[in-house]
Amino acid sequence: MKITYRKSAIGYSRDQKATIRSLGLRRLNSVVIHDDTPTIRGMVFKVRHLVSVEEIADDTSPDAETGADLERDGGNRS
């Protein structure tokens, strides 16, 4: 599942801010890819008003699009 951080957590509880961080979301409009597990679904449910979620194909691995490779090569994908 693809999770996008859409609304700031400022003014919301520490619990919700911690959940956003635990999902790996750091800045607005950042995107993370996670496996569709009950744990992740519960975290998303808790902050559903701050994020948007898209289902992605099962053949996409979580590491394929996390952005870690973008940071290593300066944002250039080839």
UniProtKB/Swiss-Prot annotation:
Keywords: Ribonucleoprotein, Ribosomal protein
Pfam family, one: Ribosomal_L30
Biased composition (Acidic residues): 58-68
Family the entry assigns: Belongs to the universal ribosomal protein uL30 family.
Cited PANTHER family: LARGE RIBOSOMAL SUBUNIT PROTEIN UL30M, MITOCHONDRIAL RIBOSOMAL PROTEIN L30
Quaternary data: Part of the 50S ribosomal subunit.
Protein name per its UniProtKB record: Large ribosomal subunit protein uL30
Organism field: Roseiflexus sp. (strain RS-1)
